[in-house]
Amino acid sequence: AVEETGRGLFEDKAVKNMFACEHVTNSIINQKTVGVISHDEITGITEIADPVGVICALTPVTNPTSTAIFKSLIALKTRNPIVFGFHPAAQKCSVAAAKIVRDAAIAAGAPENCIQWIEEPSMEASGELMNHPGVALILATGGNAMVRAAYSCGKPALGVGAGNVPAFIARTAKVGRAVNDIVLSKSFDMGLVCASEQAVILDEPIAAE
C-alpha cells in the first residue's frame, strides 16, 4: 500500500492489517448473524437476521488494505457477497488483500464469487456499482463527496468520511501522558487514520501547562 499510494508508514500499515484480521475476527466470531438471534419472553418479540444481498463496498486510498480486509470479513460473517470498488490509486494492493481473504474463504467452503471487485476502477465505475439494481447495501469509506453520493443512491448505505476528532484534556489528567498519547495517535501511519485527533481542547486550569 505504501509503495503504490506513496502514503503512510509500512510498519503501521502492517499493524492495521493485523488488527483488521485478528481483532475483527475475534470480536465477531461468536456472534450469531443468521437465523433467530434473540427472543424476548416478556414481549414475545423474536429477532431474526437474514442476509441482505449483494454489498457494494468502496474503499479509500488512505487505508486501502485494512478496509478491504475488514469489509470482506463482515460480509462473509453475515453471508453476503461483496463487490469492491477500490480507489484507483490503490487498486493493486487492495486486490492483493481481497484475494487473500477470498482464497481463504473459498478454501473454508465459501462460494467462489463471494468476494469480487471492479477490475478497471474509476469514480464512474464506482458510481455505476453503487446504483446497480442488484446491490442491496452500500459500505462507503472515503471522501465526503463519495460518501454523500452513496447516501443519495436511494438504498441503505453506511458511510465513513473524514473526521474532525477533538481530544479533551481535563484538569485531572496527567498532561504529559495525555500529550504523548495524542502525538502517538496522530502520527500513527503518518496521520492517515480518519479517527485520529484533529484538535485539542484544554480544561482552562491546565491550559498554560
What are the language-model segments listed below?
Residues 138-150:
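Glycine-rich phosphate-binding loop
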Residues 29, 33-47, 115-135:
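A structured beta-alpha segment of the ubiquitous adenosine-cofactor-binding alpha/beta core
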Residues 1-45:
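N-terminal Rossmann-like NAD(P)+-binding subdomain of aldehyde/semialdehyde dehydrogenases
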Residues 29-104, 108, 144, 153-157, ...:
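Conserved small-residue-rich beta-alpha loop and adjacent elements
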Residues 77, 147-209:
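ALDH superfamily catalytic-core signature
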Residues 120-124, 144-146, 164:
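Short acidic loop-to-helix transition motifs that present clustered carboxylates
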